[in-house]
Amino acid sequence: MKILYAVQATGNGHISRAVELLPYLEQYGQVDVFLSGENSHLPTSLPVKYKSRGVSLFYGNRGGLNYFKMWQKFSIKRIWKEAKALPVEDYDIVINDFECITSLACKFKNKPSIQFGHQASFRSNLAPRPQKREFIGEWILKNYATATSYFGLHFNTYDNGIFNPVIKADIIAATPVNKGHVTVYLSHYSKKVITNQLHKVPGIRFEVFTKEVKTETIEKNIRFMPISNAGFTTSMIESAGVITGAGFETPAEALYLGKKLICLPIRGQYEQLCNAAALEQLGVPVVPKMHATFFVDIAKWYDMPAPTPLKLEYSTYQLVQKVIEQAKALMPSTSVGTQNESLNNFAI
């Protein structure tokens, strides 16, 4: 069986999840990966057969999106051409992690697909939302990458078709310890802005992961680290707590480890506002932006008790098994053909 796995690379979380899922997917057949986007800073060992700039989100230095850069990189002509060229018809199963070009290709070629990931959970109105819903944000969540079928992941099973997060095997196998430091990953804030706040709580040690350094450096109570999946995982396992955005993968892993968590959602990104609402229901402090006295919030939060660890109803193996069963139900009785020459339209 041939499987196309389309992965959104607008952030590191999608990449991390794909790396974790790949060995399980490969038990069912040959897996080719379509990597779309250019805002992930993690090196990847994924078997990338097709690669595109996709539609990427870019962040500013003070907690929000960089709309100008996003507009500069956007090309509807390129997206249309790549969707026409992507050979989705050559695969038995198409699994889509919120990737718009694959979704469009499946529409053009009448190919069934399954959306598997966190964004699929927002097909349900029972998934938490902020007090003020945004029409455009809701439309994007439900229409940016449509599929034939949906398999959602979230912090809680809010509805049928929504399941627990995929947690990395290294984290599941780990014994969490508390070595006193706080692990920090805030891709939407600059090193300078983060440093200004963390230096004001000298009694707490921080391990900050940022794209702005290539080697480990220490500045007073802050250890700056280059972005690394293994390094970040180890730091989080050994931390007293985690400060991060209101994405999905990192907060889910921190909650699974029973770590204290404080989240700063990316301004203007509706999905993160939805996640923030869900995290607040779980008792996680959410700070709308890094204000002038954020360091005071950190000091108070650091002394709070750790939460009860998040429980998983299904293992990664079981989740993939369910996804494949759901995807197989979409398969036509006829077999797929051979790959065509449209691969030349994609950069590898």
Residue ranges of model-derived segments:
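Donor-nucleotide binding loops and adjacent catalytic segments primarily
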Residues: 166-241, 291
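Conserved nucleotide-sugar donor-binding subdomain of glycosyltransferases
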Residues: 64-93, 100-101
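A donor-sugar binding/catalytic signature common to diverse glycosyltransferases
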Residues: 94-100, 105, 115, 235-274
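A nucleotide-sugar donor-handling region in carbohydrate enzymes
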Residues: 124-190, 211
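Conserved nucleotide-sugar phosphate-binding/catalytic loop shared by glycosyltransferases and other
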Residues: 8-12, 30-78
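Catalytic binding pocket for nucleotide-activated donors in carbohydrate/polymer assembly enzymes
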Residues: 251, 255-306
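Short amphipathic alpha-helix
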Residues: 14-26
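C-terminal amphipathic helix plus adjacent low-complexity
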Residues: 299-348
